[in-house]
């Protein structure tokens, strides 16, 4: 019995000690939630210096949407999402301003083009005629040179043929060869005649000896 009463007393003491801690934690949670609601209700206003220096373009304003504020882990303060969105939109505005040319640059470009056109000479009818005449004269000169070269080549060939024809009958070896050929032919004829005579003589002698024997 004494043990049971002692255990009950300890349990009661532990219950009384745990009650103030739970009340303290609940009060802290309520304070934090009230702070979060106050922060979320406050409107977010961008800095005036950034808005003055950087202008937003129409498509950026149309695409701009309010973002919800999120709480950081265990800090109770909103993250800087609005500042990042404003910086990205300002960058887009700068890019659009850079892409559109200013009137000063366009006027400078037009002035440069006019100066270049005034410096460059415009082609006139006289210059065109001189160029055409020069081209025709050069073409005629080239044709004359080609004709002269062809005539000289043909004349040289004709002269070479004439020289060859004139040199062929006047060769010293050709006359000697013709004479030797004629003498050789005559000797052959004489040899054949002599041999025929000898044969006839021999035949006549043989016939005479045969008659004597008979």
UniProtKB/Swiss-Prot annotation:
Post-translational modification: May be heavily O-glycosylated.
Keywords: Angiogenesis, Apoptosis, Cell membrane, Chemotaxis, Cytoplasm, Developmental protein, Differentiation, Glycoprotein, Membrane, Phosphoprotein, Signal, Transmembrane, Transmembrane helix
PANTHER family named in the record: ENDOTHELIAL CELL-SPECIFIC CHEMOTAXIS REGULATOR
Cytoplasmic side: 152-214
Tissue expression: Expressed in all tissues examined, highest expression was observed in lung and spleen endothelial cells.
Domain of life per record: Eukaryota
The protein's role, per its UniProt record: Regulates endothelial chemotaxis and tube formation. Has a role in angiogenesis and apoptosis via modulation of the actin cytoskeleton and facilitation of proteasomal degradation of the apoptosis inhibitors BIRC3/IAP1 and BIRC2/IAP2.
Entry's Gene Ontology cellular component terms: cytosol; plasma membrane
Gene that this sequence comes from: Ecscr
Protein name: Endothelial cell-specific chemotaxis regulator
Stretches assigned to the Extracellular side: 19-130
Compositionally skewed regions (Low complexity) per UniProt: 80-90
Residue(s) carrying Phosphoserine: 204, 207
Membrane topology: Single-pass type I membrane protein
Subunit structure and binding partners: Interacts with FLNA. Interacts with the 20S proteasome subunit PSMA7.
Originating organism: Mus musculus (Mouse)
Family: Belongs to the ECSCR family.
């Amino acid at each position: 019995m004494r043990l049971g009463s002692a255990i009950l007393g300890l349990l009661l003491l532990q219950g009384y000690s745990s009650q103030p801690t739970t009340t303290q934690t609940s009060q802290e949670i309520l304070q934090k939630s009230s702070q979060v609601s106050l922060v979320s209700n406050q409107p977010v206003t961008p800095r005036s210096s950034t808005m003055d220096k950087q202008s937003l373009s129409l498509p950026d304003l149309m695409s701009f949407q309010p973002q919800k504020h999120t709480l950081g882990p265990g800090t109770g303060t909103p993250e800087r999402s609005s500042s990042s969105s404003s910086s990205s939109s300002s960058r887009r505005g700068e890019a659009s301003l850079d892409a559109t040319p200013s009137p000063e640059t366009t006027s400078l470009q037009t002035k440069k083009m006019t100066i270049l056109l005034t410096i460059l000479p415009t082609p006139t009818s006289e210059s065109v005629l001189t160029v055409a005449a020069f081209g025709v004269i050069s073409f005629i000169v080239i044709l004359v040179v080609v004709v002269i070269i062809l005539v000289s080549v043909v004349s040289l060939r004709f002269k070479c043929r004439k020289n060859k024809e004139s040199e062929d009958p006047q060769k010293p070896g050709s006359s000697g060869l013709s004479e030797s050929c004629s003498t050789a032919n005559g000797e052959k004829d004489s040899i054949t005649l002599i041999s025929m005579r000898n044969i006839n003589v021999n035949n006549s002698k043989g016939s005479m000896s045969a008659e004597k024997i008979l």
